[in-house]
């Protein structure tokens, strides 16, 4: 039997600013170290009392609440700690500004599936699924804090463990960045001198994706650490650089399409690469297949010609629409490198000033 009550499908109605309280990301931001709610949770953990806390007091939540007592007081970490000494759940407002109810028995539909074994955690997971709002369970015996939201469960880690993991990941990311810079420079030289092979392109794409993945892992730790992650965030930004734009540029250069690739085709190729598991990513044939190139070992040494997006991207202030016009007109990077100022300025929308700027930029790069 399927439960008849459905989770909230439009969380925008309960947003605070640009942060949505119904998402894992939005809730983790509000549970970061130093926030009032996290302070209250840490007090509960230290007190070994356990807790069941619902973030939201809409009709879906009210419909499964039984007993307890209603009041409307401002949120305070100490107040939350005292109220959680009682057996029932505590209901908070969606903006976390008010404590609405306490000592409440939650009665979500028992037909919602749960993998939890403890009574408190089973109730928390089912309540989150039933209402669509975030629910927090604090284990009395294990001193752990588990968040249930968006059909997922997430156990909060101590800041020290998160910092240690993030720093280790930064070390890995630094090695990935060094290797990416090496293969990137090699590909750049090959592009300027017309000896690019498929494996040159694949090697760069592989390392760009590896850099993206480890950066995504660190993003999660940064989110959960909150204000404690400022230094890590700075290092992450430096190591990441302009990787997202560079990933789009290399796909735009080498994706096999009729004419210049559309944005949708570029994003579809990047999405396909992101779905490869780590082992599949290391197989050059899989990347070649996404690009529309022959996925054979022999074909990896075949020459390919770039359209010119990567090189034009290295020239300051050249916008994508100008790149498109130039590449439609000249076809590939070799023709662009051999074009004169007059040739470039004759392209519709380019003009003499941009033509001179682009010619000078190409000259400096080569």
Curated annotation (Swiss-Prot):
Protein keywords: ATP-binding, DNA damage, DNA repair, DNA-binding, Magnesium, Nucleotide-binding, Nucleotidyltransferase, Transferase
GO biological process, one term: DNA repair
Record-listed E.C. numbers: 2.7.7.85
Top EC class for this record: transferase
Domain DAC: from-to ranges: 21-159
InterPro entries to which the protein is assigned, alphabetical: DisA, DisA/LigA_HHH, DisA_sf, DNA_integrity_DisA_N_sf, DNA_integrity_scan_DisA_link, DNA_integrity_scan_DisA_N, DNA_integrity_scanning_protein, RuvA_2-like
Gene3D superfamilies named in the record: 5' to 3' exonuclease, C-terminal subdomain, DNA integrity scanning linker region, DNA integrity scanning protein, DisA, N-terminal domain
Name of a matching Pfam family: HHH_2
Binding site residues for ATP: 88, 106, 119-123
GO MF annotation list: adenylate cyclase activity; ATP binding; diadenylate cyclase activity; DNA binding
Required cofactor names: Mg(2+)
Catalytic activity: 2 ATP = 3',3'-c-di-AMP + 2 diphosphate
Metal-binding among keywords: no
Complex formation: Homooctamer.
Role description: Participates in a DNA-damage check-point. DisA forms globular foci that rapidly scan along the chromosomes searching for lesions.
PANTHER family linked: DIADENYLATE CYCLASE (PTHR34185), DNA INTEGRITY SCANNING PROTEIN DISA (PTHR34185:SF3)
Family from the record: Belongs to the DisA family.
Name the UniProt record assigns to this protein: DNA integrity scanning protein DisA
Organism of provenance: Corynebacterium glutamicum (strain ATCC 13032 / DSM 20300 / JCM 1318 / BCRC 11384 / CCUG 27702 / LMG 3730 / NBRC 12168 / NCIMB 10025 / NRRL B-2784 / 534)
Lineage, broadest ranks: Bacteria, Bacillati, Actinomycetota, Actinomycetes, Mycobacteriales
Gene designation: disA
């Amino acid at each position: 039997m399927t439960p008849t009550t459905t989770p909230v499908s439009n969380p925008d109605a309960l947003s605070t600013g640009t942060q949505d309280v119904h998402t894992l990301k939005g809730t983790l931001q509000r549970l970061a170290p130093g926030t009032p709610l996290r302070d209250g949770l840490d007090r509960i953990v230290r007190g070994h009392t356990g807790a069941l806390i619902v973030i939201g007091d809409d009709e879906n939540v009210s419909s499964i609440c039984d007993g307890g007592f209603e009041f409307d007081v401002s949120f305070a970490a100490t107040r939350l700690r005292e109220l959680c000494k009682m057996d029932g759940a505590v209901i908070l407002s969606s903006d976390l500004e008010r404590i609405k109810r306490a000592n409440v028995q939650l009665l979500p539909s028992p037909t919602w599936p749960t993998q939890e074994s403890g009574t408190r955690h089973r109730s928390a997971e089912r309540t989150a699924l039933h209402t669509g709002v975030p629910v927090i369970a604090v284990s009395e015996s294990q001193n752990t804090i588990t968040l249930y939201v968006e059909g997922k469960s997430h156990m909060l880690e101590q800041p020290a463990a998160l910092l240690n993991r993030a720093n280790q990941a930064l070390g890995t990311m630094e090695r990935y960045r060094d290797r990416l810079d090496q293969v990137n420079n090699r590909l750049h030289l090959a592009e300027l001198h017309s000896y690019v092979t498929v494996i040159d392109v694949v090697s760069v794409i592989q390392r760009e994706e590896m850099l993206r993945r480890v950066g995504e892992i660190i993003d999660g730790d940064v989110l959960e650490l909150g204000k404690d992650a400022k230094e890590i965030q700075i290092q992450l930004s430096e190591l990441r650089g302009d990787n997202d734009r560079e990933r789009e540029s290399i796909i735009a250069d080498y994706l096999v399409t009729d004419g210049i690739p559309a944005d949708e085709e570029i994003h579809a190729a990047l999405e396909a690469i992101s779905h490869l598991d780590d082992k599949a990513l290391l197989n050059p044939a899989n990347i070649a297949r996404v690009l529309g190139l022959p996925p054979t070992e022999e074909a990896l040494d075949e020459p390919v010609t770039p359209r010119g997006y990567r090189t034009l991207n290295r020239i300051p202030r050249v916008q994508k629409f100008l790149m498109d016009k130039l590449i439609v007109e000249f076809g590939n990077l070799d023709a662009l490198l051999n074009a004169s100022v007059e040739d470039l300025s004759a392209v519709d929308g380019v003009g003499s000033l941009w033509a001179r700027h682009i010619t000078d930029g190409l000259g400096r790069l080569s």
